[in-house]
C-alpha cells in the first residue's frame, strides 16, 4: 500500500506543480489511465514495489501528503476484505511481461524529470503570453482567450508516461523532433524565441475559409507515418503573406468585385437611358418646330406689311386724284354760275 499511496501522491503533486490548465481532454484521459494502474497495483501487492525503492525516492518535502494519501488508500483498500480469502493459482500468469513492472518502477523518476523539464520549457512561453504583445508584432489584434487556453492545455499530452498513450510530434522553425514516452526535452534559448513569436502571431482559423492551413502545412501531425510522409514546412512558409490578409477595418467596408451587375440595376439603367433619349429627341423636335413656325410667321408678317405699304401708297394716290377731281368740279360749278349770271344781265336791259 505504500507504493500505491506513493504513486497517488506523486501524481497529485505533479498536478499541483504543473502550470497548465487540467480541464482539457488530455488531462482527463491521463487521469483515467492512472486510475487503471492503481487498480492493478491494489491486487498485485506481492509483485509490486519493494519498500527500499519506495523509501529512496526524491520527495523529501511531501511527507505530510504521503501520510494523508496512505491513510485514505488503506481505508479504500481494506473496506472489503472478502477478496483476500479467495485462492488463485497465479503461476500461469507472467505479470512482469504482462504489466511491465520494470516500467512502473522507473516511472516516478522519469515523471519527475519530464515534469521539471517541461515546466522550465513552457514557463517563458506562459510569461510572454500573459504580457501585452507589442503593436508591431501582431497585425491581427489580441488573440482570444480560448486560443491561449488551448495552447496551455495541449502540451500536457507530452507528460503521459504510459505505453498505451500516443506520441505527439511538434515542429519548430529551426528543426522538427518527436517526443518519445518519458523522454527528456532540452531546447536552447535560441529555439524558444521563435516559438514564442509563433504563439503571438498565430493566425486564427476563423478569419477566412480559404486561408485555413491543413495539418501538414502547419507542421503538426498526430501520427509518425503522416509526419514522415509530409514535407517539412516552417511557420514562415505556411502562413499567407501579410498583403493577402484582409485588414480588420477594410474587410467589411469594401465588397468583393463582382463579374456582372445585378439584373435589376441593368434594367433600371437601360430604362433611364431610354427615357432620357426620348426626352432629348422631343426637345430637339420641339425646338425645330418652333423655329420653323417662327420663320413662317415672320414671312407672313413681312408679306402682310409689304402689301399694306403698297395699299397705303395706292390709297394716297387715289386721294390725290379725288382731291384734284373735286377741285375741277368746283371750278366748273363756279364757271357755270358765272355764265348764268352773265346771260341774265344781258336779258334785262
From Swiss-Prot:
NADP found in the keyword field: no
Record note on modification: Ubiquitinated by SCF(BTRC) in response to mTORC1 signal, followed by proteasomal degradation and leading to down-regulate expression of SIRT4. Interaction with EP300/p300 inhibits ubiquitination by SCF(BTRC).
Lineage: Eukaryota, Metazoa, Chordata, Craniata, Vertebrata
Region (Interaction with GABBR1): 303-339
Biased composition range(s): Polar residues: 229-239
Comment, domains: The BetaTrCP degron motif promotes binding to BTRC when phosphorylated.
Phenotype of null mutants: Mice were born at a much lower rate than predicted by the Mendelian ratio. Homozygous pups generally die during the first hour after birth, although excess mortality occurs throughout the first 3 weeks of life. Embryos are severely anemic during fetal development, due to an impairment in definitive hematopoiesis. Surviving mice display defects in embryonic lens formation leading to severe microphthalmia in adults. Embryos show delayed bone formation and surviving mice display low bone mass throughout postnatal life.
Region Disordered, residue ranges: 49-75, 204-271, 279-298
One of the GO biological process terms: gluconeogenesis
Covalent link Glycyl lysine isopeptide (Lys-Gly) (interchain with G-Cter in SUMO2), residues: 258, 270
Motif (BetaTrCP degron motif): 214-223
Chief location: nucleus
Induction: Regulated at the translational level in response to various stress such as endoplasmic reticulum stress, amino acid starvation or oxidative stress. In the absence of stress, ribosomes re-initiate translation at an inhibitory open reading frame (uORF) upstream of the ATF4 transcript, which precludes AFT4 translation. In response to stress and subsequent EIF2S1/eIF-2-alpha phosphorylation, ribosomes bypass the inhibitory uORF and re-initiate translation at the AFT4 coding sequence.
UniProt region (Basic motif), positions on chain: 278-298
bZIP domain residues: 276-339
Tissue specificity statement from the Swiss-Prot or TrEMBL entry: Ubiquitously expressed in adults.
Listed transmembrane segments: none
Family the UniProt entry places it in: Belongs to the bZIP family.
Pfam families: bZIP_1 (PF00170)
UniProtKB keywords: Acetylation, Activator, Biological rhythms, Cell membrane, Cytoplasm, Cytoskeleton, DNA-binding, Hydroxylation, Isopeptide bond, Membrane, Nucleus, Phosphoprotein, Repressor, Transcription, Transcription regulation, Ubl conjugation
Name this polypeptide is given: Cyclic AMP-dependent transcription factor ATF-4
Amino acid at each position: 500500500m505504500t507504493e500505491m499511496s506513493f504513486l497517488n501522491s506523486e501524481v497529485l503533486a505533479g498536478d499541483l506543480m504543473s502550470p497548465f490548465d487540467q480541464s482539457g481532454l488530455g488531462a482527463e484521459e491521463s487521469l483515467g489511465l492512472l486510475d487503471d494502474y492503481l487498480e492493478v497495483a491494489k491486487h498485485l501487492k506481492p509483485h509490486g514495489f519493494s519498500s527500499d525503492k519506495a523509501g529512496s525516492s526524491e520527495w523529501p518535502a511531501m511527507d505530510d501528503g504521503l501520510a494523508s494519501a496512505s491513510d485514505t488508500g488503506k481505508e479504500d483498500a481494506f473496506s472489503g476484505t472478502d477478496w483476500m480469502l479467495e485462492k488463485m493459482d497465479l503461476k500461469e500468469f507472467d505479470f512482469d511481461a504482462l504489466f511491465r513492472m520494470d516500467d512502473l518502477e522507473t516511472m516516478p523518476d522519469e515523471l519527475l524529470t519530464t515534469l521539471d523539464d517541461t515546466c522550465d520549457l513552457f514557463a517563458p512561453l506562459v510569461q510572454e503570453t500573459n504580457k501585452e504583445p507589442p503593436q508591431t508584432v501582431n497585425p491581427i489584434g489580441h488573440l482570444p482567450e480560448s486560443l491561449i487556453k488551448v495552447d496551455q492545455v495541449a502540451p500536457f499530452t507530452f507528460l503521459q508516461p504510459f505505453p498505451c498513450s500516443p506520441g505527439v510530434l511538434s515542429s519548430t522553425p529551426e528543426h522538427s523532433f518527436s517526443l518519445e514516452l518519458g523522454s527528456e526535452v532540452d531546447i536552447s534559448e535560441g529555439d524558444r524565441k521563435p516559438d514564442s513569436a509563433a504563439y503571438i502571431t498565430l493566425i486564427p482559423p476563423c478569419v477566412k475559409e480559404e486561408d485555413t492551413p491543413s495539418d501538414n502545412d502547419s507542421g503538426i501531425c498526430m501520427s509518425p507515418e503522416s509526419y514522415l510522409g509530409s514535407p517539412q514546412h516552417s511557420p514562415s512558409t505556411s502562413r499567407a503573406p501579410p498583403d493577402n490578409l484582409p485588414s480588420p477595418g477594410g474587410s467589411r467596408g469594401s465588397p468583393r468585385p463582382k463579374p456582372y451587375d445585378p439584373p435589376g440595376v441593368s434594367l433600371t439603367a437601360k430604362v433611364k437611358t431610354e427615357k432620357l433619349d426620348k426626352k432629348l429627341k422631343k426637345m430637339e423636335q420641339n425646338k425645330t418646330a418652333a423655329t420653323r413656325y417662327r420663320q413662317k410667321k415672320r414671312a407672313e408678317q413681312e408679306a402682310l406689311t409689304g402689301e399694306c405699304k403698297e395699299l397705303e401708297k395706292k390709297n394716297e394716290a387715289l386721294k390725290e386724284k379725288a382731291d384734284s377731281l373735286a377741285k375741277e368740279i368746283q371750278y366748273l360749278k363756279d364757271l357755270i354760275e358765272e355764265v348764268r349770271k352773265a346771260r341774265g344781265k344781258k336779258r334785262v336791259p
